[in-house]
Swiss-Prot record:
One of its GO terms (biological process) is ribosome biogenesis. SMART domains: Ribosomal_S3Ae. This is Small ribosomal subunit protein eS1A. GO terms for molecular function: structural constituent of ribosome.
Amino acid sequence: MAVGKNKRLSKGKKGIKKRVVDPFSRKDWYDIKAPAFFEVKNVGKTLVNRTAGLKNANDSLKGRILEVSLADLQKDEEHSFRKVKLRVEDIQGKSCLTSFNGFDMTSDKLRSLVRKWQSTIEANQTIKTTDGYLCRIFVIGFTSRRVNQVKKTTYAQSSQIRAIHQKMFQVIQNQANGCSMKELVQKLIPEVIGRAIEKATNNIYPLQNVFVRKVKILKAPKHDAQKLLELHGESQDVGSKVISDVAPLESV
């Protein structure tokens, strides 16, 4: 007779089932609020573990990076190849107040632009906004045929590429310097910088499909409650004295 445990036998008593706990029962949904310079303010919801003990749900949400399609933010499918990154700065009730944290292009759109018989020209420039953001702007463009050109290829010479790089740097500096982040985003959405580069480089070599490929935030300012409310169009006097004896306004 063999002596020892039979590993095939199940542990515990028969008939007792392990209790299944729904993981979503310990989580809460929070609304995501986009800054006021986008057309849509309520962009979705995010999930977080409910406050328990020393773990606070608000602390888990702060600093979270969310990626949203620009088409959803602007209600325009033409911007479906754009992605906007939003960073959660503060929590008000069940709402997450966010700030702009980056701009990107989808990989399928970028791959569709790269073709043979043309030169790809890229440049990037670091700029600082008036409200304290330090960001790097990446642009990309492609050479196109000249008017009445018979030649199949549109390859630019190295000297022309260097000249186009200089023009790209100048246009980015001229368009971005002296702008706040809100004003910069309002230029990025309609592709103002890309059109300005096409116009500035036309006499060197004609370009097509010039886009701001990416905006990377290198350094962001700290947002206090008042500035964050202004960013979301909910600015109000915080902590100001309330005067009860106020004369009623005359009807107009």
